Structures are given as structure tokens and as C-alpha cells.
Amino acid sequence: MECLRSLPCLLPRAMRLPRRTLCALALDVTSVGPPVAACGRRANLIGRSRAAQLCGPDRLRVAGEVHRFRTSDVSQATLASVAPVFTVTKFDKQGNVTSFERKKTELYQELGLQARDLRFQHVMSITVRNNRIIMRMEYLKAVITPECLLILDYRNLNLEQWLFRELPSQLSGEGQLVTYPLPFEFRAIEALLQYWINTLQGKLSILQPLILETLDALVDPKHSSVDRSKLHILLQNGKSLSELETDIKIFKESILEILDEEELLEELCVSKWSDPQVFEKSSAGIDHAEEMELLLENYYRLADDLSNAARELRVLIDDSQSIIFINLDSHRNVMMRLNLQLTMGTFSLSLFGLMGVAFGMNLESSLEEDHRIFWLITGIMFMGSGLIWRRLLSFLGRQLEAPLPPMMASLPKKTLLADRSMELKNSLRLDGLGSGRSILTNR
């Protein structure tokens, strides 16, 4: 009640104060103020002495800093609670597999990476950060260190089968990898590139028979019409082929980008910069950068072969499309020709049907008394219509015939014989001159 009674006194004084002073007063009253029961006496102090103390810049700065610290602490707590958790599968040099869960913040702090380095990207890429190789292949993300290989968040059944059955043996040296005598990162990179090439090859091997079978059914000359269901299947397979061509192109571009720069090849040899023994071997005779270049060139050629195979399928689809269009045009031409023939027949019948129209006007004539006149007029009508229709069809056939290629004018036999005799005479003269010159030189 005392607070309510003191409001008329406080409001005029509060209206004179600036907005920042009022905010500071509100913060201070809510944080360190006394209970509400003692508001009457405190109200007068707020109007006079407390307002003067709180209006200072130091007091305002302290209140703003406290408010800022509170919001930053809350935001950090919420970010820590919302931080994503990765399911990490670790492979060491001996092929041992361990799985664990780790927060993203903890993981990139342990690996010495930045938060942007562990972002998921659906584009194929190979990058090096802080002596760590980061490989992204759509749903596969891997971090390669000189000691181990980390696979982050695999969510594919086929990938799981490859991870736990084939990859450990390849990393331990029991597989058919060419880079087994080289450091660990070579084996890891080769295993991942080999898996991705096999994946692209599998997609192509699935699409190729489907596309060829559909094209054979569409281009078959036995079928006069085009099956729309086959066209729909071909359209879907064409879209899948376009996606495969894009994946192969991105794979080739990512490898070619590394091959064009020697510094990136040197950075991919991470054991060279962390292990002094490997550095001595690389300095002595084994050039690890050159070995890495040969490895990437090999898989670039494999990707190029896949690209050529996909391009051949695309050319077959385009050629078959042109053949289908030609067949459709031929069927359309047949229908148009039939329409012209029927139109000509209708025209000829209507032309000689005028005779029947003349007799149907109910006019009296002497021809109606003879019973043979009906059959005579009817026969003349049909014969005349048939003759005119035949003439129109022959005219149409002459107009639609393809023009013959121009004939080459043949030379007469006499000129050919004369040319041959002249050639023989010239050859004999040259031989005679040559023999005479040789005799003179011998003498």
C-alpha cells in the first residue's frame, strides 16, 4: 500500500530521468532491492539520492557487464548441451577396431582441427589440416592421422559391411593394397579411394544392362509403336546416369586439383613431417610425394575409364532418341499420306455425285421413264470417281518420290585408250633417255 501511495510522487520525478537511468534503476531494484513492504521509505530515496548514484557511467557499465556475462554463460551452456555427438570408428595400423561416441567440440580439440573442418559436405573433397587428412565422400567422412583412421557417423549398411570386414585387413597389410610398404596414410587413402571407385563401378554396372535392354526394346523394328512405359524407365535411368556422371566428374576434379599442386602432394605425406625415420627415408631415396602422385594418377585413370563408359551410354541414349524420333516421323508420314488418299477419294466421289444431285431435284425429264438410265448413271459415277482418284494417287506418288542422286558423266572408251597409250609412250621415252645417259656415263 505504501508503494501505491508513493507512486504519484515518483512518477513526475521518473519522467524527468533519461531511459538509461530508468533501466539501471530497474535492474538494481530487482537484483538487490529490499522487500516490497519497505517500498515507501525507499521510494523517496530512489527519487533523490539513489538516482544520482545510479546515473553515473561506472554504475551503468557494471550493470551492463553483469547482464552480458549472464547471457554469455547461458548461451555457452545451451551450445554445450546442443553440441552434436559423433559415432567414431577408429582403425589403427594393426587393423584393430574400436568404436566410441564423442562430442564435436571435444573431437576437434583432440585432433587439433577447427569446427569448420568437421562439417558434413556431400561433395567429394580431400584436404589437409594440421597434419590431418580429411576425406569427404557423400555419406562417408574420414580423418587420417599418421597413427590411425577415424570414420565419423557411418549410416549405410553397405558401408558397415565394408568397414568391419574388408577395411581392417587392408589396413593391416593382409589385403591387396599396393601401398603396404609405405606409411599408414598411403594405405588409408588407397583403401578409401578403392572403395569409392568400386561404388561408382557398381552403380554403372547396375545401370548399363538396364539402359541397353530398354534401348533394344525401343529401337526394335518389329514394334510399330513406342511403349510409353519403356520411355519412362529410360527417363529414370537417364537421370541416374546423369547423377553418376556428376559424381565421377567431381571425383576427377578433386584428384586433379591435388595433382596440379606439388605442395598439396607434400602435405598429404603426413608421416613424413611427424616421424623422423620416415623423413630420413624420404630424403634418402624414397620420394613419398612421387609415390602419392602415382597413387592418385592410378585412380584418376580408373575414374576416367568410368567416365568414358558413362559417356558411351549417354551417346547410345542420344542416338536411340534420334532413331525413335525418325520412326515416329515415318509413322506420322504414313498417317498423313493415308489422310490425303481418303481426302482425294472423298473429293472424286463428291465430284461425280453431282450427277445424282441433278436427278434428285424432282424435275420431270424423259430419262426417268427408261429403267436402264439409273444403272448407266450410277456406273458412270463410280467409274469416273475411280479414274479421278487413281489419277490423283499417281500425282501424289510422283510428288512424294525421293529425287535420284545426280549421275556422274562417264568418259568414253576412246579417250581412256588414248590416255593409256600416251602414258606408255612417255614412260618408254623416259626409259630410253635414262639408258642412253647411263651408257654415256659408263663410257
Swiss-Prot record:
Keywords assigned by UniProt, alphabetized: Ion transport, Magnesium, Membrane, Metal-binding, Mitochondrion, Mitochondrion inner membrane, Transit peptide, Transmembrane, Transmembrane helix, Transport
Transit peptide range per the UniProt entry: 1-49
Binding site for Mg(2+) 2: D329
Motif GMN motif: where in chain: 360-362
Residue ranges, Mitochondrial intermembrane side: 360-370
Pfam families registered for this protein in UniProt: MRS2-like
Membrane topology of this protein: Multi-pass membrane protein
InterPro entries assigned: MRS2-like
Keyword tRNA processing: no
Chain residues that bind Mg(2+) 3: G360, N362
A GO BP annotation: lactate metabolic process
MF terms (GO), sorted A to Z: magnesium ion transmembrane transporter activity
Broad class of the protein's primary localization: mitochondrion
Recorded superkingdom: Eukaryota
Miscellaneous note of the record: Has the ability to complement a deletion of MRS2 in S.cerevisiae and partly restore mitochondrial magnesium concentrations.
Recorded family membership: Belongs to the CorA metal ion transporter (MIT) (TC 1.A.35) family.
Role, per record: Magnesium transporter that mediates the influx of magnesium into the mitochondrial matrix and regulates magnesium metabolism. Also permeable to calcium, sodium and potassium ions. Required for normal expression of the mitochondrial respiratory complex I subunits. May play a role in maintaining the inner mitochondrial membrane potential.
Protein name: Magnesium transporter MRS2 homolog, mitochondrial
Protein species of origin: Homo sapiens
